[in-house]
Amino acid sequence: MNVKYIGLSEINGPLVALDHVSGISYDEMAEIKLDDGTRRLARVVEVEKDRAVLQVFEGTKGLSLVNTTTSFQGKPMELALSTEMLGRIFSGAGKPIDGLGEIFPEKYRDINGSPLNPVSRTYPRNYINTGISSIDALTTLIRGQKLPIFSGSGLSHNKLAVQIVRQAKIADENGQDFAIVFGAMGVKNDVADYFKRCFEETGVLQRVAMFLNLSNDPIIERILTPRCALTCAEYLAFEHDMHILVILTDMTSYAEALREFSSSKGEIPGRKGYPGYLYSDLASIYERAGIVKGAKGSVTQIPILTMPNDDITHPVPDLTGYITEGQIVLDRNLDQTGVYPAVSILPSLSRLMKDGIGEGYTREDHQMVSNQLFAAYAKVQDARSLASVIGEEELADTDKAYLKFGTLFEKHFIDQGFDVNRSIDETLDLGWSLLSTLPKSELDRVDEEHLEHYYSAEKAKALFAED
C-alpha cells in the first residue's frame, strides 16, 4: 500500500523533514507534490526513529509545510539503461537534455551499483592507447585501472580530457567495442559547451555517453552524477561486453558538494570541513572500476581533480591517491612555458603499468625505455639545480648533455600538441631518439641487445639538428 504523507515538519535549505513516518529506508526515493500540482523528486538522506530527512533534487522553493504531499517509492534511485545511451547527453541525474527525447530502457539499475566480490576480480592487463606520449610511455593506462589526473585551477585538464576522449582506443580483440562514458560535475556553461562542441565536431560523440552537471544545478545532482555515469558504464561493460573508459571531472567539485551536503545535515566535519566518510565515499566511486571473471568487458576510470592551491596533500587528492592505482600530475611551471600536455613526469606513475606493457601488449623494449627516460629526466633536474648555483658554463660535459636532453625531452616528447596522435611505436621510437642524444655509457637501464638495436647518435643528431 502506497501511503501519502501530507505536510512537512521542517524545511531547511535543500532538506525537508517528515515526522511520524514508518517503513522508510535510507536512500529511498520519494515524490513530493506541491500545491500547484508540480512534482519533484527527493531522496531519503537520514532516518531516525519515526523521522525522515529528504533532500529535494530541484530545491525547496515553493514548498509548503501544510499542503505538500510526499509519497515514498520503496526503492533507491534507478537509472534507465540502454545501448542507445551512446551518442546522447544526459543531466547529472540521468535525464536526457539533448532534445532527442527519452531513451527506451532495456533495464533499470540501482545507481549505487552492486558491490564486487574481490575474489571475482581479474587482474588488469593490456593497455588503452591515448595517443599521448607522456601517458602511453611513462604512465601507461591499463584496462580496468583507475588512474587519476591531478591538475590545478587554470591548467589544461579539460583540453586533455577532450584529447583522451578523441584519441583513446584499444587493440581490437574478438571484435569487442570500445566506448567512453564522460561525467562532468559542477562545470560552467562555457566548459560544458566546449565539451559538447569538441565531441560533435570530431565525430566521437557517437561512442560517448555524456552526463553533465552544471555549476548552477542542485548539489544533490552533483553527488549522483558519477554514480549514474558508472552505472551506465557497468551495464555496457558487463552486459554488452564492451570496454568502457569512464572520465570523471571534476572530483573536487564532487567533494565540495559532499561537504555542503554534509554540513546541511549538521554532521561533524573532518579535515578542512569535509565529512569524515569522504574516504569511503570516494572509494565507493573509484572501486567500481575493474574486470570481472567471466565477463568480456571492462571498466577503466580516469578521475580528474583540481588540487586547491596546487596542494597535493589536500584531502581530495590525498585520499584519491590512497584508493587509486597511480596518478598523472600536471605541472603549472611547464604549462606556463607553453608545454601541452603539461605532465610532470617524476611525480606521475601507473602502478599497474608493468603488467600491461611489453611483448604481447605494447613492445618488448617499453619497460626499459620508460625506466631510462625516468632516470635521465631525474638527472636533468639535478643538473638544472647545480647550474643554478655554479652556472651552466662550469658544468661537466655529461651534465651539459643532460641539460640538452631535458630541453629536447620537454619540447619534443612531453609537448606534442592537441592534434597530435602518436602510436605506441612512434612514442617509443621518439624516446630512443632522445636517449641517443646522451652518451651510450649513461644508458644503464637498457640491456646491451636493445641498445645496439635502437641507439643511434647519428639519427638523433639529424632529427634534432635545428635544436
Kindly label every feature range from the protein language model.
Residues 1-4, 10-130:
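Acidic-enriched and Gly/Ser
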Residues 151-152:
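The Walker A (P-loop) glycine that initiates the GxxxxGKT/S ATP-binding motif of P-loop NTPases
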Residues 155-206:
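Conserved P-loop
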Residues 175-194, 211, 215, 226, ...:
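Conserved P-loop NTPase motor core
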Residues 253-254, 260-467:
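Conserved catalytic/coupling modules of large nucleotide/cofactor-utilizing molecular machines
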